[in-house]
Amino acid sequence: MPEGGASISNTEQGAAAGTERPDLTPHRRTGLLVTFLLGSLTAVPPLAMDMYLPALPEVTRALHAPAATVQLTLTTCLAGMALGQLVVGPMSDRWGRRRPLLAGLGVFVVATVLCALAPTVELLVAFRLAQGLAGAAAIVIARAVVRDLYDGMAMARFFSTLMLISGVAPIVAPLIGGQVLRVTDWRGVFVVLTGIGILIGALVWTRLPETLPPAERHSGGVGEALRSMRGLLADRSFAGYTLTGGFAFAALFAYISASPFVIQEIYGASPQTFSLLFGLNSVGLVVVGQINGKVLVGRVSLDRVLGIGLAIVLTAATALLLMSLGVFGEVPLAPVAVALFVLMSAMGITLPNTQALALMRTKHAAGSASALLGTSSFLIGAIASPLVGVAGEDTAVPMAVVQLAAALVALACFVGMCRPWKSDGHTAGKSDGITAGTTAGKSDGITAGTTDGNTAGKSDGKTDGRRASVEGADS
């Protein structure tokens, strides 16, 4: 029995299968419930952010605060999620995945209750910071669990599957938020979010087994964690994919932070109309993410797909800036909504592939690698967030400028640091679930790529055994 009561079985059977070709259908290897649970964990950040979005104008009025100050409630939550991942990721490498995850979810629930009770915008900002710090455990450990269970192309497929689940959150969250505002005020949004946090925590407690065996945990303290992160950042490709994903996320978060004001204040849409548009954009992201996982991965180089995604984001951001500047005259909401839909949909082939390509560079420090991935994304997003409000609420130019600048920097990092034209390990032909072709870099002093057949077989035996263990816990 693992910690918390979730049962584990069939480990030896899975380990014995190390020489077989892994089944790339994620739910068959991991179990439907655990797959859904991991997706729910990755959905905690969009739930915490997006459910609250329709209430931003009301918070501005209710707490008598300027829009820029209210937007800090988004920025601080995002910054908390960034910094929290740096702490929780290495903790999960040392103490396993379950205990830090359960502790983080508990604090998240308490912080959400305090947000609902906040009497001033200053306290709301502080409580949102605490909420973000605690919520970081969900996303960073979910990614680390995936890395525990999968390698190579199978990992890329699984991330796309998680996007199908976690992508429901941006669709449903603003709709829930908009409906809550019909019957109560903005505080009710945090009450509902508290209930969701309790439900996810209960599922983790009862259904998610430990995926990092004690023998593979790091025994060192802060020093070892820092050395591990330094080793990861010394790998230019890992750093390049991490920064590429971070700046792509900044373009996404510029939309998240500014769109409530652009759509509701500039174009006069209701909170319910905004929620529907936001949900439609999230549908585009989910659908494209599934095309990525079920059609493109294994057939087209991940680097090539990522490059196409970045080009689409850049094109959509350019169109938004031209419309915001009035180059085409007075533009109605529809063309702006189309451009935002295209930008959001392109994230479905951008974000999961940057995560998979970066995590292919490491195996023995998945928590630290996941922490660096998440921290860069959330920290860069937190910096971008207040920039969209510097010119006030009556123009969309700052949002478009931030999106375009972020897309340009993301593309520069991808081309300049990742050097996709030299990639030989992320092509369609290497979809056997083994971390193929990543012989260039070392992660925390351990060679990330293994070209020796025996070593690869051992690595696959471990991940197969873990997947069998999780499947046993889900049955």
Outline where the language-model segments fall.
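Paired small-residue
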Residues: V107-L114, E122-A130, A334-A339
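Conserved MFS/SLC helix-loop-helix module at the cytosolic interface between two early adjacent transmembrane helices
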Residues: L83-E122
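A late C-terminal transmembrane helix in Major Facilitator Superfamily
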Residues: Q355-E393, Q403
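Helix-loop-helix hairpin linking two adjacent transmembrane segments in secondary transporters
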Residues: P119, L123, S160-L208
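Structural signature of the two symmetry-related core transmembrane helices
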Residues: R99-L114, T194, R304-L320
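Helix-breaking motifs and short loop linkers at transmembrane-helix boundaries and internal kinks
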Residues: A62-H64, G96, L117-L123, A134, ...
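Cytoplasmic helix-loop-helix junction between adjacent transmembrane helices
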Residues: F127-S166
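Juxtamembrane intracellular "pre-TM" segments in multi-pass secondary transporters
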Residues: T19-H27, T211-T242
